[in-house]
Amino acid sequence: MKIKIILLSIILVLLPTSIFAQKQDASAVVQSFYKFHLSRSGIFNASEVNARKKWFTDDLNKLFQTELQREKEYLKANPTDKPHFGDGFPFQPFDECESAGKLIKNTYQVGAATVKGEKATVEVKFYQPKECGGDLIDTYKVELVKSNGKWLINDWLYSDAKTLTEDLKRTNY
């Protein structure tokens, strides 16, 4: 009987810790992704998609590969037009402000994860730099799924209730 009580006590102590670790891990993945993403070119091309693929689910990676092919075909037929992701990856609002003739990037804040089983949602808030007012620009939600014990990004939910995967699956280029 004492052993059962001790084991139950250990389980009750460790359970909240493991739940916290899951939340922390999902947020840490998003934080790591944005740190990497913002350290590189935001240009949407095969090299940059491949550089980010370790953070994405297989499904999201496939959608990006399909988009690259669609873009290639579109540009072949319309060489002077801007492609759909011609302004770069849609992982953040258009950023930068100008202060004293210098272009200054926006800042971001990664929130805590909301975990439900094998899915997590992490809120990311984007702010103007302090030099440009520091106001909140937009909030995105990053959806993650657990695959082989690892959190992977599966989608972005934008403030207008549209998602990245919906955009990538659009019928018309």
Language model segments and positions:
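Low-complexity, intrinsically disordered terminal/linker segments enriched in charged
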Residues: 115-141, 147-148, 152-173
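Amphipathic alpha-helical surface "interface" segments used
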Residues: 49-63
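Short, aromatic-enriched amphipathic alpha-helices that serve as compact interaction elements
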Residues: 25-41
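Bacterial Sec-dependent N-terminal signal peptides
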Residues: 1-24
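Surface-exposed, charged secondary-structure patches
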Residues: 57, 64-132
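Surface-exposed patches in mature extracellular/periplasmic domains of secreted proteins
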Residues: 40-52
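N-terminal helix-cap/turn-to-beta initiation motif at the start of protein domains
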Residues: 20-28, 141-147
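Short, charged low-complexity linear motifs
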Residues: 20, 41-42, 70-78, 136-140
